[in-house]
Amino acid sequence: MKTLLLTLVVVTIVCLDLGYTLKCHNTQLPFIYKTCPEGKNLCFKATLRKFPLKFPVKRGCADNCPKNSALLKYVCCSTDKCN
């Protein structure tokens, strides 16, 4: 019985994420991502404003959403792999 209880505790610890960590895409390819460092609680995607296909040119983690520029439009979100 003690072995079963210990096993359940170990499995619970392994399965739980002790502290939330955000995962954001960090390349132009949508299937590659990284875990954001502490304090970076947003994912962003930058696209060229004047380009008709809206292909992302930059993705990553941020603490604040970057400001749009004349060349780049930024979209930010706060869930895993949302960019």
Swiss-Prot record:
First-listed, main subcellular location of the protein, grouped into a coarse class: secreted
Transmembrane intervals: none
Compartment annotation: Secreted; Target cell membrane
GO biological process: killing of cells of another organism
Signal peptide start and end residues: 1-21
Molecular function per GO: toxin activity
Cystine connections: 24-43, 36-61, 65-76, 77-82
Keyword NADP: no
Name assigned to this protein: Cytotoxin homolog 5V
